[in-house]
Every structure is written in structure tokens, then in C-alpha cells.
From Swiss-Prot:
Positions glycosylated per UniProt: 22, 36, 168, 184, 229, 253-254
Lipidation (GPI-anchor amidated asparagine): 254
Disulfide bonds: 237-245
Name of the protein in question: Merozoite surface protein 2
Gene: MSP2
Chain intervals for the UniProt region annotation (5 X 12 AA tandem repeats of P-P-I-T-T-T-E-S-N-S-R-S): 51-74
Comment on protein domains: The N-terminal region appears to be involved in lipid binding.
UniProt membrane topology term: Lipid-anchor; GPI-anchor
Length: 280
């Protein structure tokens, strides 16, 4: 901005000096400059007004000479009329000076301050902020939350309910409600008794798997857990510790997220350096 302003000011003064010294010889070289077009118009208007004043001045002398010749040819009584004629052209030439002063001032100082400011301030501030905020915050959260919570619950439910609750879960909720309504119509107290040992059976098989005191419980736990104990996180999920389920997967996801965040930081820093180098 400072360089552009200084160059425009220097160009303005150079153009004024050439017009003062050489007239209109160098006027064709500054046609493309917008700042100098207004100055040319003002100088052209002033030059035309001064030429009109110079052209009208000798005409007044000719009118005065003509009036004197008419007075000399007519008689001595017409001298008063001749003098009145000599005074009238000087009064008629005076309005030309007023017209030359009324056109020049409002043209020179309008175009120089209206074009430069709106170009530099709009482009530098609009490109950098939307890159940093949108991409970095939209990719990291859905990776960690969805995968860790979606894999652990189906492992625990299928193993514990494989003994007695499998046929109840395969049927839909509407079929269970229809069966319960039919049983309630036939006997009100009958279905309550077999449901309680089923819940007890669901609670009892989890105990030998966790403790491992008897041989039968130990073998049963080893058969069920041998193909699934490939990592420590799945052991903790089968034991019932839901807090530690998916810990290894979350660590891997965090490492991938850290790598992606580092890439975004490098890209953002590169764009900022390029923007500063271009605009500064």
C-alpha cells in the first residue's frame, strides 16, 4: 500500500511539471493512468477558457476603433455615443473569467482515494480461518466413540445367554408379548415359577468362569474363551469389566488421530507461510 501511494504521488507531480513546461506534448503517454485523466480534463478546461479570453481581447480593440471611425465620420455630436460603445465590450468580456474558475476545482480530488483501499483488505482475511476449524474437529470424535462402544456388548451377551435365553432373544418383542398373554390367560401363576430359575441360571454360569475353582468350570471357561482370547482387551470384556473394553482399539485409533492431526498442522502452517509471503 505504501509503495503504491508513493508511486502515484510521484507520477502526479511528474505529470504536472511536464504540463507546465511543455504544454500538451507529453499528454499521450499517460492515457492509461486513472489518476491523471481528471487532471488532464481540468487542464484542458482551463486552457480553453484562457484562449477564449485572449481571442476576445483584440475584438474589443476593433470594436473601439470602429466606434471611433464612426464618430469621426458622422460628426462631433456623436462622440458621446462612440465613447459609450467603447465601454460596452469590456463589460461583456468579464463573464468569461468567472466561467473558467467554476469548472476546474470539483474534478481533481475525487478518483484518487476511492479505488485503492477495498482491494487489499478483503482477500487476506477470508481464506485462512475456515481451513483450520472445520476439518480438524470433524474427523477425530466419531472414530473413537462409535467403534469402542459397538463391538463390546454383543460379545458379552451372546456367551452368557447361549444356555437358556437364546430362543427368547431370537423371537421379536411382539412374539414374546403374544406368548405371555396366552400364558396369562391359561394360568396366572404358572409361568412365574420357571422364569425365576432361568434368571438364576443366567447368573450362575458367570461365577465358575470368573473364579475358575473347579475343573469343570475351568474347562468350560477355556473352551468358550480360547478362540476369543486373542488380546487382553477381549479378556477384560468377557470377565465383565466393561470399562476396559476396547482399550487397545482406542489406543490405535488415538495414534491414527494424532498422525492425522499432525498432517493437518503441517498443511495449515505451510498455507500460512505462503499467505504471509505473498501478501507481505
Amino acid at each position: 500500500m505504501k509503495v503504491i501511494k508513493t508511486l502515484s504521488i510521484i507520477n502526479f507531480f511528474i505529470f504536472v511539471t511536464f504540463n507546465i513546461k511543455n504544454g500538451s506534448k507529453y499528454s499521450n503517454t499517460f492515457i492509461n493512468n486513472a489518476y491523471n485523466m481528471s487532471i488532464r480534463r481540468s487542464m484542458a478546461n482551463e486552457g480553453s477558457n484562457t484562449k477564449s479570453v485572449g481571442a476576445n481581447a483584440p475584438k474589443a480593440d476593433t470594436i473601439a476603433s470602429g466606434s471611433q471611425s464612426s464618430t469621426n465620420s458622422a460628426s462631433t455630436s456623436t462622440t458621446n455615443n462612440g465613447e459609450s460603445q467603447t465601454t460596452t465590450p469590456t463589460a461583456a468580456d468579464t463573464p468569461t473569467a468567472t466561467e473558467s474558475n467554476s469548472r476546474s476545482p470539483p474534478i481533481t480530488t475525487t478518483e484518487s482515494n476511492s479505488r485503492s483501499p477495498p482491494i487489499t483488505t478483503t482477500e487476506s482475511n477470508s481464506r485462512s480461518p475456515p481451513i483450520t476449524t472445520t476439518e480438524s474437529n470433524s474427523r477425530s470424535p466419531p472414530i473413537t466413540t462409535t467403534e469402542s462402544n459397538s463391538r463390546s456388548p454383543p460379545i458379552t451377551t451372546t456367551e452368557s445367554s447361549s444356555s437358556g435365553n437364546a430362543p427368547n432373544k431370537t423371537d421379536g418383542k411382539g412374539e414374546e408379548s403374544e406368548k405371555q398373554n396366552e400364558l396369562n390367560e391359561s394360568t396366572e401363576e404358572g409361568p412365574k415359577a420357571p422364569q425365576e430359575p432361568q434368571t438364576a441360571e443366567n447368573e450362575n454360569p458367570a461365577a465358575p468362569e470368573n473364579k475358575g475353582t473347579g475343573q469343570h468350570g475351568h474347562m468350560h471357561g477355556s473352551r468358550n474363551n480360547h478362540p476369543q482370547n486373542t488380546s487382553d482387551s477381549q479378556k477384560e470384556c468377557t470377565d465383565g469389566n466393561k470399562e476396559n473394553c476396547g482399550a487397545a482399539t482406542s489406543l490405535l485409533n488415538n495414534s491414527s488421530n494424532i498422525a492425522s492431526i499432525n498432517k493437518f498442522v503441517v498443511l495449515i502452517s505451510a498455507t500460512l507461510v505462503l499467505s504471509f509471503a505473498i501478501f507481505i
